[in-house]
């Protein structure tokens, strides 16, 4: 070991640039290549990773291993370069027992409440930072268009503007408002914008498949949210798994160099996703060996290489054989060291803080925030007047369904025992989670009986016939197959329903059907769930007692006829008369059961709105609202193209009336002359019901005639507006003319002169929007 105490790179009074230059000059090639590697700590052999491989970063580090890793750096390495420790803290610190698990990212988007999303990011950072983890691989900025894709739950939905608003907010929360290059407070963590870019544009929903994306399509929809957080200072970017135009994103010069580093002047750190470099050799087969893969990855601008152990030998060979100039290694390592100096890790490795762990993780304040977000993350999509339900002594509530009392499935993916780590086999503490059954038992008044029946199973697990391990050595999970029908479970649920005044049926999906490698060919409910719903709907028709269906799932699913009517060219809605109300709760987190029970019992007003469109049938996909204008006809020969529920939809327990929109600042000339101008639109909004409620007023812009094909309308602003019964407010929106853009055939974003529509209202559906126009010269 060398005494490094007096060396310049150890001197906190020197500028970071001088410290980096000094340290870089002392490092061997092996040490520099090691700094570019982030490896999986679950192997347990920390000495091999840190001492032999010289790794600069680790992930998936258990609570027991984290302090030991830091000690190994300090006592067994030559230069004592601190580790940067990352983990998947996707909607809370997923893999720390007792941490606050919020609704999924898609659930948070359902709130249409950026302030709450920022608060969730802040709370997550406060908890994560106590544990010695410095960096979360969040948020996901992918656009969810094909809902068969397994990672829809990790997104903020289908609209680029909404994604940008939510991503910007959560990044500010994680980083405590710090921008790229600025020091991070003790209770802040680095954010990571992923998966750059176009990863979600799959073939048939299949995860990590080739993305059929032109530069124009990328510029039009997929890049704007990333551009926003890049310019606002998101500390790191993660690169997607997929290929575009035959080039894996990891090696895509146009995206990494021309756009991100070039046009956007991004100075942060780039990290590959899991084994991207290795996959180019063993799966995509676009690189002959690890030396060529490592050389091309570094040349493309990658800094940290996630979980590709052979990058170490490959990069060293590439330098020594002339495939790669060592100066490019130096540039990448300089950016990694800058990140570590920014975090102050050389002076304070940010070890786990036991006192803060006790007081911050799962704190009362964070649990209250979690409940507030859960309340806003539920979208009521159908209600014939049965809700809110008045529970009282002598009444009976049947709570049925396989997810009504499943605490861990309620949390969704990236939460304890969802499959990513091995130290939480039981998941998050049961006592911290309020299931829907728990919620009704807590809230039902004395003398009101709450009775549970499972009703159906969702999946059975079987061995994967392709073997126990993937080609990269990771264990293959068991396969999920649709569960066999269980008549006894169904009979018990039907009997429970017949004896009750209200039936709440909770259905959805499970983590084995969600996530990486877990895309689905269909969107139907699996197992005996549809049979259960149809049987319960028959009971509701016979007894006249209300049936409420709660879909608790990772993504929109195709609901049976008893919920949405019988599909066809013309939908037969008469078959949906057995279900009185339908609501969606996208993995609502630890407090989701309480929030849902509060909504059904009328203690909380539903205010969630859909961040993503619900199809009637998987064959309708894609159904996102902002599709390009122009096709022959507006329906299939055998099925409507109208979705079950559209982007922006959601009901409350009161009603709202919109006035006519006006542009209040039209110039004397009648036209807005420059892109520096701002259009101010106003509309009156009145609560015409008898309850206090919250409306999400949405503003869409449509360019009426465009030189290049474009969508009919795009979300450009929204506001949550709370109104007392009978109250009227004037809601104002400021829309910069510079935001009223299209993208031309050369992939340039432009504002064209001409007439524009301003559409304001309740949802993305034309029938829900009030219209006015303005003109740009």
Residue spans for each PLM region:
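Glycoside hydrolase catalytic-domain context in secreted enzymes
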Residues: 1-744, 752-766, 773-777
């Amino acid at each position: 070991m060398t005494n490094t105490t007096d060396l310049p790179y150890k001197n906190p009074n020197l500028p970071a640039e001088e410290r980096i230059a000094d340290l870089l000059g002392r490092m061997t090639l092996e040490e520099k290549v090691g700094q570019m590697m982030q490896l999986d700590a679950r192997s347990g052999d920390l000495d091999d990773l840190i001492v032999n491989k010289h790794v600069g970063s680790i992930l998936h580090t258990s609570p027991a291993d984290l302090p030991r890793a830091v000690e190994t750096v300090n006592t067994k390495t030559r230069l004592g370069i601190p580790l940067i420790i990352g983990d998947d803290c996707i909607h809370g610190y997923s893999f720390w027992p007792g941490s606050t698990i919020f609704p999924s990212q898609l659930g948070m988007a359902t709130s249409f409440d950026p302030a709450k999303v920022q608060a969730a990011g802040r709370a997550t950072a406060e908890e994560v930072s106590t544990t010695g983890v410095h960096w979360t691989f969040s948020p996901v900025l992918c656009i969810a268009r094909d809902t068969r894709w397994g990672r829809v739950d990790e997104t903020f939905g289908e609209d680029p503007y909404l994604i940008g608003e939510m991503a910007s907010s959560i990044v500010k929360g994680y980083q405590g408002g710090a921008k790229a290059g600025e020091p991070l407070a003790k209770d802040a963590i680095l954010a990571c914008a992923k998966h750059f870019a176009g990863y979600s544009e799959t073939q048939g929903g299949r995860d990590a498949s080739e993305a059929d994306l032109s530069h124009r399509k990328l510029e039009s929809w997929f890049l704007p949210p990333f551009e926003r957080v890049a310019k606002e200072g998101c500390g790191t970017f993660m690169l997607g798994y997929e290929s575009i135009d035959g080039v894996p994103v990891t090696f895509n010069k146009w995206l990494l160099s021309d756009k991100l580093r070039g046009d956007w002047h991004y100075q942060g750190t780039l990290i590959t996703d899991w084994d991207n470099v290795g996959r180019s050799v063993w799966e995509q087969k676009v690189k002959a060996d690890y030396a060529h893969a490592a050389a091309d990855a570094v040349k493309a601008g990658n800094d940290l290489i996630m979980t590709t152990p052979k990058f170490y030998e490959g990069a060293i060979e590439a330098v020594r054989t002339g495939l790669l100039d060592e100066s490019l290694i130096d540039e990448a390592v300089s950016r990694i060291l800058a990140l570590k100096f920014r975090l102050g890790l050389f002076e304070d490795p940010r070890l786990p803080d036991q006192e803060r762990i006790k007081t911050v993780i799962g704190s009362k304040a964070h649990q209250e925030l979690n409940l507030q977000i859960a309340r806003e993350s539920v979208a009521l999509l159908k209600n014939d007047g049965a809700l809110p339900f008045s529970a009282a002594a002598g009444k009976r509530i049947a709570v049925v369904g396989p997810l009504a009392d499943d605490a861990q499935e309620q949390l969704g993916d990236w939460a304890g025992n969802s499959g990513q780590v091995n130290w939480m086999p039981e998941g998050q503490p049961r006592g911290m989670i309020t299931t829907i059954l728990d919620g009704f038992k807590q809230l039902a008044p004395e003398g009101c009986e709450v009775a549970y029946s499972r009703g159906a199973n969702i999946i059975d697990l079987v061995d994967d016939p392709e073997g126990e391990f993937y080609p990269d050595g990771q264990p293959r999970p068991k396969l999920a197959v649709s569960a066999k029908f269980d008549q006894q479970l169904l009979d018990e649920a039907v009997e429970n329903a017949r004896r009750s005044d209200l039936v709440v049926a909770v259905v959805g999906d499970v983590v084995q059907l969600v996530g990486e490698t877990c895309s689905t060919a269909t969107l139907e409910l699996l197992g005996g769930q549809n049979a259960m719903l149809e049987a319960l709907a028959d009971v509701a028709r016979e007894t006249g007692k209300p049936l409420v269906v709660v879909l608790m799932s990772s993504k929109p699913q195709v609901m049976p006829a008893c919920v949405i009517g019988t599909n066809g060219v013309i939908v037969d809605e008469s078959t949906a008369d057995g279900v009185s109300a339908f609501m969606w709760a996208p993995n609502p987190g630890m407090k989701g059961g309480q929030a849902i029970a509060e909504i059904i019992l009328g203690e909380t007003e539903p205010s969630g709105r859909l961040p993503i469109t619900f199809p009637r049938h998987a064959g309708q996909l894609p159904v996102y609202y902002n599709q390009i204008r122009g096709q022959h006809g507006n329906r299939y020969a055998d099925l409507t193209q109208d979705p079950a529920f559209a982007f922006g939809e959601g009901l409350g327990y009161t009603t709202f009336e919109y006035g006519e929109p006006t542009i209040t600042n039209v110039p004397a000339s009648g036209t807005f002359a420059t892109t520096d101008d701002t259009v101010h639109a106003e509309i009156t909004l009145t609560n015409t019901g008898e309850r206090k409620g919250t409306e999400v007023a949405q503003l869409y812009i449509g360019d009426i005639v465009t030189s290049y094909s474009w969508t009919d309308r795009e979300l450009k602003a929204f506001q949550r507006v709370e109104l007392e019964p009978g109250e009227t407010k004037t809601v104002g929106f400021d829309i910069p003319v510079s935001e009223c853009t299209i993208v031309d055939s050369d992939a340039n974003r432009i504002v064209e002169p001409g007439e524009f529509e301003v559409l304001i209202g309740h949802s993305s559906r034309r029938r829900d929007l009030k219209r006015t126009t303005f003109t740009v010269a």
